[in-house]
Amino acid sequence: MVIKDLSPHNNSLRKKYLDLIDYGNKNPLTVDPNLYQLRKTILLEGLPPETEEEIEDRTKQDGSKCSLRGMIWKILLGVDKIQPDKYIELIEKGPSNRYQKIRKDIGRTFNRDSQFSQAVSQDQLSRCLNAFAHQCEELGYVQGMNAICGTFLYVLPEVEAFQCFYSLLTQCCPNYFTSNISGVNDASKLLDRILEFVDPELYEYLQNRSYHPLLFTPPILSLGTATPPLDELLKLWDFFLAFGFHLNVICTISQILLMRDVLLVHQSPCLLFRSFPELDAPTIINLSIHIIRQLPDDIYDLLVDHPMTSVDLTPFDRDPNNLNSFNGSGEFDNDNDNDNGNQDEEDDDDDDIDDGHNDYFNDNDE
């Protein structure tokens, strides 16, 4: 349920975001420090609840106004120029060659969430997904895109939602949506190693009970959209869009750790992974930040890169003579020389979210 809280604190927080957005629009040369402040505010304070006006506009289904969350998501994705003519041109091409698959998935999209069904029509989903399949034939359509697209349609007007959807899939995590979903497979391997690193006891218990990291393909591929409720998912996405969707791997681990007590007394714990408990975004984010602070730089760098490009995980493959690559003390044992160690100086100017490992998430942020 959406909280309709118009308290002085939330009004003040809303004004803070609007002032940041206004300053950024008027001072385009300050984009980097402005983005830094925007991300920092999201991390420390979150976004304020929606206003009555935003809720009413969204439930019209033809609402044309962009909510505060929508404005912030567009900024974080670098979507500034809206191209309605291009979108109409794609729609006019009609059903794509993936139409039958898209049609099957549309009816499953947040079908238990009444607020979603009031705000987003199946026609909107169909138009967006078929338009994407036309515009990006190399990616086409992969199951899970429907919920990702639906999330944008819930927050943004249709044309803007499409452009954000396109930007996310092609610029933030294209490796997840190749024909062999290679980025998702890499994410599963990274999840496996990081879970072992942060909780060796739980990891060993799962290993002895039919555990396999590919069990977590659905929450990774869906970017968290497979677990309700939707209003908590939006808070997770605020975090992901601010700091990178690679953090979905860490947040999935956090969800596993929050189930720890139940898992350790269950004879078939892996059955519980078919459906995670409902999202509690603040708890998941706080635990994820704690995990991030523990990670060695080489592991974090691979985590950052894997949604964008293929990463070499062979240095971290299990040695059959030594199944414990992690030594269980918070350090990674690896004698192989590789290029995935500390970040080179030439990367210092890169405005990617990997600076967050050393900057946004330091101990002074809480």
Curated annotation (Swiss-Prot):
Family: Belongs to the BUB2 family.
Residues covered by the Rab-GAP TBC domain: 63-244
Protein keywords: Cell cycle, Cell division, Cytoplasm, Cytoskeleton, Mitosis
Single GO cellular component term: spindle
Region (Disordered): 314-366
Gene Ontology MF terms in the entry: GTPase activator activity
SMART domains with a match to the protein in the record: TBC (SM00164)
Organism expressing this protein natively: Dictyostelium discoideum (Social amoeba)
InterPro entries: Rab-GAP-TBC_dom, Rab-GAP_TBC_sf
Swiss-Prot/TrEMBL GO biological process terms: cell division
Pfam family, one: RabGAP-TBC
Alphabetized Gene3D superfamilies for the sequence: putative rabgap domain of human tbc1 domain family member 14 like domains, Ypt/Rab-GAP domain of gyp1p, domain 3
Protein known as: Putative mitotic check point protein BUB2
Function recorded in the entry: Part of a checkpoint which monitors spindle integrity and prevents premature exit from mitosis.
Gene: bub2
Residue stretches of biased makeup (Acidic residues): 332-354
SUPFAM superfamilies (UniProt xref): Ypt/Rab-GAP domain of gyp1p
